[in-house]
Amino acid sequence: MIKKIGIFVLFFFATIHANAQLQKQTINNGWKFYYAKASKWYAATVPGTIHTDLLSNKLIADPYFGDNEKKLQWIDKENWDYKTSFTVSHKILQQKNIELVFDGLDTYADIFLNGKLLFSADNMFRQWRANIKPVLKSRNEILIRFYSAKNKVDSI
């Protein structure tokens, strides 16, 4: 079985909340992840994990077959970038308060919106919120850089 220590990229829901009458826009389509060994972006499923994304793109062998899991121990030692683009309506842009909300970022990650660092996450077991009103545009890009939890812990 794949070790739970690996980088499990879990975005249960990345959403935008705009106040007034609460409006919610779920951002779980169009995600891609960057595979450094191939210097290429690949399709990703959010919510999901890096292991399932690598498997669905045929970049790793089935970890449940034979001793393949032993050959996949490198995955939790890598950093992984995930990104997507999304648009918001003029109505949302006019709202006074707009937040980006993540339920489950595993574990160490920097979150960027339109190239600006919003926050750094260090705990998967909480909700993360950021005021995005100052950087939100009609067309936007989120980039999430996940750092190897194993490497972080080993460096302490």
Annotate each language-model stretch with its function.
Residues 1-23:
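Bacterial Sec-dependent N-terminal signal peptides
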Residues 12-14, 48, 57, 71, ...:
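A subset of signal/propeptide-processing and intrinsically disordered low-complexity segments
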